[in-house]
A protein has these predicted regions:
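Internal nucleotide-binding/catalytic subdomain
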Residues: 167-308
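Short acidic-hydrophobic, aromatic-tinged amphipathic segments that line or gate anion-handling sites
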Residues: 57-64, 136-140, 171
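Active-site "cap" helix and flanking loop/linker of ATP-utilizing ligase/carboxylase catalytic domains
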Residues: 260-283, 300-372, 380, 387
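A conserved helix-loop-beta module that forms one wall/lid of the active-site cleft
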Residues: 105-167
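Generic C-terminus detector
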Residues: 393-447
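ATP-binding N-terminal substructure of ATP-dependent carboxylate-amine bond-forming enzymes
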Residues: 1-109
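Solvent-exposed alpha-helices and their adjacent loops that cap or buttress functional pockets
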Residues: 2-5, 28-30, 45-46, 75, ...
């Protein structure tokens, strides 16, 4: 869909730290009129507060309430929508909006299946020769348990559908593997998402995340990154949505980058085109650099979180124009430059996350942390203490992300941690080793 209007009212679907980072960039576009977040969060509600140039309003409408979202968009003179989270994408929100004549950034339901079903993505990779782990798909619990019980260890058990980033179990014993299968397929741990499982080999090597804009023809990979998914230092503890990210990833060499482009990124886009599922939006490649070459661990049909908070500040250009070009099929005409700086996003979480944690804890800041420390603070699990309040309280497991951009990775990591010392709430928790393995690799590369 072509957009000729100069000033655009924009709806951004989502309410986490990733959406805060995206909204902050969209608000900088000369074409941004009003921005509405559905639902938004406490920090987003104070973005550009009192500004006439680009007011930002949070609606409180849940990102999965598709009918309400469509009604809001149609009744509030919205010119462009950006659907960010996985659930509404997999549920087909972009299709619903486009059917109503609303230009929309994000893949169709047919394309979002690349994340919505791990069985689909594994079979796509097998069919088109895209390197990934050896695997089998099961819809029968007995067969899955039998296969897992005799698989070499460790073995990976994955729920087929969306599971908030927690649907992957790395089993070190056969008992753990069988338990994972039973929890998903018999115990309903992830509902319908676990009715089918993928059992696959365990791969070793550095992990790399690569986000890429694509309109189905042109692809623009963004700076690589390294997520830290485990809750505890030294990659211990439970899987989380992500406790911190550094970018670029020093393990992702120029040679690896070229190999991934030729053996993974381009073949994936070509495969989706061949299947009649052309992907337009932001495609996330979760990779492992194994001794036998790069392998795909997972695809996501959207911006990663917290990868976006670290990567987006390294992307130069008008994000709104990039999004418009992506949905219009004109990405080849869009100017996108990538910074040569480094970034670190440190996540501050509620104590007990990702399991049981308390909410409603007052968040305080020692002065203007963003201005004083030269960082960006992106709100994830926050809300206003009262509707008219300027105080924030915690409302989720991952509360804030602090992003520092500096000339070197070491400086970025140090700056993010220094800023975090000036943010306070009861039970505040963060890992103390974000970027540590990357710094070691960087020092080895640079002597």
């Amino acid at each position: 869909m072509q957009i000729t209007k100069d000033k655009l009212n924009i709806a951004v679907i989502g309410g986490g730290g990733r959406e805060h980072a995206i909204i902050r960039r969209l608000a900088q576009s000369r074409r941004a009129g009003k921005i509405y977040a559905l639902p938004g969060n406490g920090g987003i509600s104070r973005e550009h507060a009192g500004s006439d140039s680009c007011p930002v309003t949070c609606t409180g409408i849940a990102a999965t309430d598709l009918e309400k979202i469509v009604d809001f968009v149609l009744n509030n003179e919205i010119d462009f929508a950006a659907v960010i989270p996985d659930d509404p994408l997999v549920m087909g929100l972009c299709d619903m909006l486009r059917e109503k004549g609303i230009p929309c950034f994000g893949p169709s339901k047919a394309a979002a299946i690349i994340e919505g079903s791990k069985a689909f993505s594994k079979e796509l990779m097998q069919k088109y020769g895209i390197p990934t782990a050896e695997y089998k798909v099961f819809s029968d619990a007995d067969a899955a348990a039998e296969y897992a019980a005799h698989h070499s260890l460790p073995v990976v058990v994955k729920a087929d559908g969306l599971a908030l980033g927690k649907g992957v179990i790395i089993a070190k014993t056969h008992e753990e593997a069988i338990e994972a299968v039973n929890d998903m397929m018999r115990g309903g741990k992830f509902g319908r998402s676990g009715a089918t499982v993928v059992v696959e080999e365990f791969l070793t090597g550095p992990e790399v995340s690569v986000l890429a804009f694509t309109d189905g023809k042109t692809v623009v990979p963004l700076p690589s990154s390294m997520d830290h998914k485990r809750a505890g230092d030294g990659d211990t503890g439970l899987n989380t949505g992500g406790m911190g990210v550094i970018a670029p990833n020093p393990f992702y060499t120029k040679a690896a980058e070229e190999q991934v482009m030729q053996s993974i990124i381009l073949p994936t886009l070509n495969a989706m085109n061949a299947e009649g599922r052309t992907f337009r939006g932001c495609l996330y490649f979760g990779l492992m650099l194994t001794p036998n070459g790069p392998r795909v661990i997972e695809y996501n049909c959207r911006f990663g979180d917290p990868e976006t908070q670290a990567v987006l500040p390294l992307v130069e250009g008008d994000l709104l124009e990039i999004m418009i070009a992506t949905q219009a099929g004109t990405l080849d005409k869009c100017e996108i430059k990538l910074s040569d700086k480094s970034s670190c996003c440190l996540v501050l979480a509620s104590g007990g996350y990702p399991e049981k944690y308390e909410k409603g804890k007052l968040i305080t800041f020692d002065g203007d942390v963003e201005a004083d420390c030269g960082v960006c603070i992106f709100h994830a699990g926050t809300k206003l203490g009262t509707p008219d309040s300027s105080e924030f309280v915690t409302s989720g497991g991952r509360v804030l992300g602090i992003t520092a951009v500096r000339d070197t990775l070491e400086e970025a990591v140090r700056a993010a941690y220094a800023a975090a010392e000036r943010v306070h709430f009861d039970g505040k928790y963060s890992r103390s080793d974000i970027g540590l393995s990357a710094l070691r690799e960087s020092r080895l590369k640079n002597g």
